[in-house]
Regions:
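Active-site metal-binding loops of divalent metal-dependent hydrolases
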Residues: 16-17, 58-61, 98, 119-120, ...
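Cap/insert and terminal regions of metallo-dependent hydrolase folds
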Residues: 70, 74-78, 182, 186-270
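Basic, amphipathic N-terminal segments that precede the first structured/catalytic domain
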Residues: 2-37, 260-270
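Conserved beta-strand hairpin/beta-sheet module of binuclear metal-dependent hydrolase folds
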Residues: 16-78, 182-196
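Core dinuclear metal-dependent hydrolase active-site scaffold
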Residues: 13, 44-48, 54, 157-188
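Divalent metal-coordination and catalytic microenvironments
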Residues: 11, 47, 57, 90, ...
Length: 270
């Protein structure tokens, strides 16, 4: 059921990179066969209504991809142009968390307010960053970048769940990081959840076998349940790194196949 005074959003998942790996890298309890190929994709997302354009996460740079051994297919910021979005004009960017693959390129959004959870800023600049295992997925330049934007009065903090705009809500879960959040949007097919890293892969959720980069395992598993509860059905859940998103959902046009998916539309074959 649509909320009162809701806006209806088109939702775009834009793939900008991949990483070839085995199943053992993607699950806390490696499934059999644990050495089978199990790549992940890297995405940014865009939520577009008649009145608002909101970018969700900002991806990583080519330099970051090279340092970390990731396949960088295209610039995530430039790729927004594929769906008619000029990053220089975007006024609202949701940072679901500040890991390197979600919080880079902030300087490419000169007019944006960056939305982040209180707990994420505290986590990535606090005592837990003394430990390499917890800071490994953060890029110090990105962390300095969001602090710089704070001093430029361009960061909006959120403490838990909130409505950003009519029909677009933010939900804190923690787990993967202390300040991990996801986005829920009202679409023509109902409530769709852009889970980001609250749920990396469909199988992490369905098999109750979470992704192994985690601050609190229990919070991550509870986060899977919250994602599922706030989506209208399992087909309304969009994981943060699953290659099947490109296979399941239609592209806006044939030339954007395997680059952009319209996740506000029903999966193919339904």
């Amino acid at each position: 059921m649509a909320p009162p005074m809701s806006e209806t959003y088109k939702l775009y998942a834009i793939k900008y990179g991949t990483h070839a790996r085995t199943a053992a890298r993607n699950f806390m309890q490696p499934p059999d066969p644990h050495d089978a190929p199990y790549p992940i994709d890297y995405y940014v997302w865009a939520c577009v209504s008649e009145n608002h354009t909101v970018v969700v996460d900002t991806g990583f740079t080519k330099d970051a991809a090279e340092r970390r051994g990731r396949d960088w297919h295209r610039c995530p910021v430039d790729s927004l142009k594929l769906v008619g979005i000029d990053a220089a004009e975007v006024t609202d960017v949701v940072i679901t968390h500040m890991h390197y693959d979600h919080g880079g390129n902030l300087d490419r959004f000169p007019k944006a307010t960056f939305h982040i959870q209180d707990q994420e800023m505290a986590h990535m600049t606090g005592r837990h960053m003394r430990y390499p295992v917890l800071r490994h997925s953060y890029d110090i330049e990105d962390v300095c970048g969001i602090v710089r934007e704070l001093y430029n009065d361009r960061v909006e903090f959120h403490d838990g769940d909130t409505e950003l705009f009519p029909g677009l809500t933010l939900h804190h879960v923690g787990g993967h990081t202390q300040g991990m959040m996801f986005v829920r949007a009202w679409t023509e097919r109902g409530w769709v959840v852009l889970a980001s890293d609250a749920m990396h892969l469909y199988a992490n959720w369905l098999d109750r076998n979470p992704y192994p980069t985690v601050v609190h395992i229990g919070d991550m598993l509870e986060g899977h349940r919250k994602v599922a509860r706030l989506a209208d059905s399992p087909d309304h859940v969009i994981p943060g790194h699953d290659p099947r998103v490109m296979d399941r959902y239609p592209a806006p046009s044939e030339d954007l196949k395997d680059i952009v998916a319209r996740v506000d539309l029903p999966p193919r074959g339904t």
